[in-house]
């Protein structure tokens, strides 16, 4: 299809310009009466035509007929007004008006088309001017005369016995439309130049003609698959996020470092789900504004809100998962983060900073479902506010996970010596969870970069579709089909299941039952409805304090804990005086965190509290 359009352009340029560049001073030229059956007869206001030496009407008419009847010629132009003016200019350029009986010379001179005829083409064929590379109304012939004079051309004929300043009027037939309204082939939308220059979010494919909104670039089946996947998984993820926030934020007696990170993750996942919910709210396609052809941008409040939530949720989740992997790394190495509060404040400050900074640059695109940082004009905001911080944090996450895997591998001998494979299983489960979620966030952060640097694939699909519209019309052109839908679907899938992964990695564990059983608030609520489960039904103010340990709470649990028939006594680090006691502390603290995050620095925190 693209090749056909190129052939059309060759036809246009060749037949437009071939006759125009013939030498105007041709002593062998002659005048003839135009054959009335010529296809150009209705476009000329004269019958006396100019024939250069060596040409006959039959030769010229054969070329005219081939051009005007060829499906890849002028007939491919869908706009009738533009087509009429182009054919008129073509005819008066091919069959130029002949001027004979000029004083002092024996050969005729042609009249070139008046410049206003050329301007009519420029005015009425704006959407197609990009196809006429090099075409101008200020061209000259081989004698240096204007191809499209304003009123007349002047010739020095003294060498032939004529005047030194012979004027020849230009041809200006009355036929042809003077309507200068630009018409865009359906379904392209006409937009004024001022609107486009004002920075409105249009996708201009030809001068003043933009892509419609919405523009569907996948099949209905593909859109449905993506839609139902996102609806189900985002709803489930939002529910899980609320569950994690309630469990580790309200139900648990003492909030540990690890609990705070899980709460943070719950809020970032909720922000991601809120972004999806915002774009699904209301009627019509979220990408489109009320103005035809204009895609939403930050000047639309709901687009700004959606972009903010998406940036908060996406980048925030990456930051918090990196913080979680750092906490896991410290726990494996029996250390604690003494500056956890400052770290948390700093991370949240960065998240808000990178979400608010591009607040005026959120926009929707052809391929997007909602709004995010646009790269329509430049990519600075996308790189500075997402790619650079996301990739730096992801790289740190890889380092923490790799170091933790190595530590777990080294501790395998210890796990075997105490004959408790459950500990090894729990830690391997944590590592597996981190690796899977690392893959998801890496894929979702790399996919937009892949699209940016492979945009030609998508632009080519749009270009072929536009060429088809110009050649055949909308009814004969199939829907645009972007390739690599599998990657697009995988990106949506990985993003929507973050909450579900958090459930399997953090929210399903025997330790959760202990949290609910020992929770004073939860048991108090059960007591109000007549259910007795656990120990203390009345909440105390003391239980609401926060702990900087990564393990769970409860003085009873600190003294002794039973795990699948095996009881391990916990002792303070400062009370251990032998290697056996040290091993007992290490094994007990490892087993104390059934969610598979080792809890050895619990004892360090107790020691610090005693001091």
Swiss-Prot record:
Domain of life the protein comes from: Eukaryota
Cytoplasmic side: 252-258, 324-338, 402-430, 513-611
Disulfide bonds: 31-98, 40-91, 82-125, 114-184, 118-170
Name recorded for this polypeptide: Frizzled and smoothened-like protein N
Stretches of the chain found on the membrane's Extracellular side: 25-230, 280-302, 360-380, 452-491
Compartment(s): Membrane
Keyword entries, A-Z: Disulfide bond, Glycoprotein, Membrane, Receptor, Signal, Transmembrane, Transmembrane helix
Amino acid composition bias (Polar residues), ranges on this chain: 591-602
UniProt signal peptide: 1-24
Record's compositionally biased regions (Low complexity): 538-554, 576-590
Entry GO CC: membrane
Main location: membrane
Chain's gene name: fslN
Residues bearing attached sugar chains per UniProt: 63, 140, 156, 165, 179
UniProt membrane topology term: Multi-pass membrane protein
Chain intervals for the UniProt region annotation (Disordered): 538-611
Segments crossing the lipid bilayer: 231-251, 259-279, 303-323, 339-359, 381-401, 431-451, 492-512
PROSITE patterns in the cross-refs: FZ
Organism: Dictyostelium discoideum (Social amoeba)
């Amino acid at each position: 299809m693209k090749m056909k359009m190129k052939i059309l352009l060759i036809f246009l340029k060749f037949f437009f310009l071939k006759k125009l560049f013939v030498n105007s001073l041709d002593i062998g030229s002659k005048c003839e009466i135009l054959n009335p059956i010529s296809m150009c007869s209705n476009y000329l206001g004269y019958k006396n035509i100019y024939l250069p030496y060596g040409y006959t009407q039959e030769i010229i008419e054969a070329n005219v007929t081939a051009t005007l009847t060829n499906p890849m010629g002028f007939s491919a132009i869908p706009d009738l007004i533009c087509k009429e003016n182009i054919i008129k200019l073509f005819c008066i350029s091919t069959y130029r008006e002949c001027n004979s009986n000029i004083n002092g010379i024996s050969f005729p001179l042609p009249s070139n088309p008046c410049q206003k005829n050329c301007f009519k083409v420029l005015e009425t064929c704006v959407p197609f001017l990009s196809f006429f590379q090099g075409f101008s109304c200020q061209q000259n012939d081989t004698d240096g005369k204007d191809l499209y004079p304003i009123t007349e051309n002047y010739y020095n004929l003294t060498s032939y016995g004529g005047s030194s300043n012979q004027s020849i009027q230009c041809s200006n037939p009355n036929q042809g439309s003077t309507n200068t309204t630009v018409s865009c082939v359906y379904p392209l939308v006409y937009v004024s130049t001022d609107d486009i220059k004002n920075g409105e979010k249009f996708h201009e494919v030809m001068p003043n003609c933009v892509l419609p909104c919405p523009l569907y670039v996948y099949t209905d089946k593909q859109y449905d698959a993506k839609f139902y996947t996102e609806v189900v998984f985002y709803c489930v993820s939002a529910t899980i996020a609320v569950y994690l926030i309630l469990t580790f934020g309200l139900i648990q007696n003492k909030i540990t470092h690890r609990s705070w990170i899980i709460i943070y993750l719950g809020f970032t996942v909720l922000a991601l789900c809120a972004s999806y919910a915002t774009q699904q709210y209301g009627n019509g396609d979220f990408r489109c504004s009320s103005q035809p052809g204009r895609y939403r941008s930050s000047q639309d409040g709901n687009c700004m809100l959606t972009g903010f939530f998406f940036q908060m949720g996406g980048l925030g989740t990456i930051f918090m998962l990196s913080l979680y992997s750092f906490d896991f790394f410290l726990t494996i190495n029996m250390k604690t983060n003494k500056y956890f509060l400052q770290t948390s404040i700093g991370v949240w400050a960065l998240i808000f900073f990178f979400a608010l900074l591009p607040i005026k640059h959120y926009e929707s695109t052809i391929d997007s479902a909602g709004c995010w940082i646009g790269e329509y004009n430049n990519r600075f905001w996308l790189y500075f506010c997402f790619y650079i911080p996301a990739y730096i944090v992801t790289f740190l996450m890889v380092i923490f996970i790799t170091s933790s895997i190595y530590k777990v591998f080294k501790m395998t001998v210890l796990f075997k010596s105490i004959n408790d494979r459950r500990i090894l299983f729990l830690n391997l489960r944590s590592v597996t969870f981190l690796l899977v979620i690392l893959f998801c966030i890496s894929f979702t952060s790399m996919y937009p970069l892949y699209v940016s640097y492979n945009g030609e694939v998508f632009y080519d699909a749009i270009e072929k579709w536009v060429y088809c519209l110009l050649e055949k019309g909308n009814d004969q052109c199939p829907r645009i089909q972007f390739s690599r839908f599998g990657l697009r679907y995988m990106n949506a899938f990985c993003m929507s299941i973050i909450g579900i992964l958090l459930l399997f990695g953090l929210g399903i564990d025997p330790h959760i039952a202990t949290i609910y059983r020992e929770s004073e608030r939860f048991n108090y609520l059960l007591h109000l409805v007549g259910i007795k489960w656990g120990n203390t039904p009345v909440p105390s103010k003391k239980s609401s304090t926060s702990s900087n340990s990564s393990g769970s709470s409860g003085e009873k649990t600190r003294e002794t804990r039973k795990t699948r028939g095996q009881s391990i006594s916990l002792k303070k680090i400062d009370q251990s005086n032998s290697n056996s006691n040290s091993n007992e502390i290490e094994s007990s603290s490892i087993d104390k965190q059934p969610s598979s995050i080792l809890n050895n620095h619990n004892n360090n925190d107790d020691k610090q509290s005693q001091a």
